[in-house]
Amino acid sequence: MQHWLDKLTDLTAIEGDGCILKTGLADVADHFGFTGYAYLHIQHKHIIAVTNYHHDWRSLYFDKKFDALDPVVKRARSRKQVFAWSGEQERPKLSEEERAFYAQAADFGIRSGITIPIRTANGSMSMFTLASERTAIPLDREIDAVAAAAAVGQLHARISFLRITPTAEDAAWLDPKEATYLRWIAVGKTMEEIADVEEVKYNSVRVKLREAMKRFDVRSKAHLTALAIKRKLI
């Protein structure tokens, strides 16, 4: 397992674009006998993924918002250090919904795995998982938690630096009016000024931005604007 961590660390140092990094991650997973890999970045309630999991599973996971149900994500949020997991071995203590989740994942060759979660900036979390179709991961020795966190920390930095386009992410959208108003916010306009420029009532601007803030589950226009820019919605 330490050899795998070394390979991951070496990969993050290779020059190249996001495509090269994704290919390298897939090669590492395959070389060590795993079904696939998944990097998740979770900030507040927003989640993005860089993964080679089956397309249908990725779509189902995000459409159904499975991150709120996923026992691996729940454990990663609370544990913040490397751990192995198995849907079969954990079955007796799982809820009916969690068992159904693992059963669906198993249809795509995801039955067990190793996950390394780390804390990242501004209260966010990143986690890297290698998934297996085996019912459990055989570990001949304990995984070095420090080395694992260091490897995933470097991976997170590399993905952030390259601004890799996510393989999947939770749905995010703005209607035309919301996008227009946020573009004005982004260049420093107040809601009163936006109302004047767009020739609408102040209350129309306020209500539209409040609707968008509620949908994105944020509490300030600054946060909403930052998310919209990050998601390339404006």
Curated annotation (Swiss-Prot):
GO biological process, one term: regulation of DNA-templated transcription
MF-aspect GO terms: DNA binding
Residues in the DNA-binding region annotation: 191-210
Residues of the HTH luxR-type domain: 167-232
Top-level taxon in the UniProt lineage: Bacteria
Gene3D superfamilies: Transcription factor LuxR-like, autoinducer-binding domain, Winged helix-like DNA-binding domain superfamily/Winged helix DNA-binding domain
Transcription recorded as keyword: yes
Keywords: Activator, Conjugation, DNA-binding, Plasmid, Quorum sensing, Transcription, Transcription regulation
Function: Positive regulation of conjugal transfer of Ti plasmids.
Family: Belongs to the autoinducer-regulated transcriptional regulatory protein family.
Protein name: Transcriptional activator protein TraR
Species of provenance: Agrobacterium vitis
Taxonomic path: Bacteria, Pseudomonadati, Pseudomonadota, Alphaproteobacteria, Hyphomicrobiales
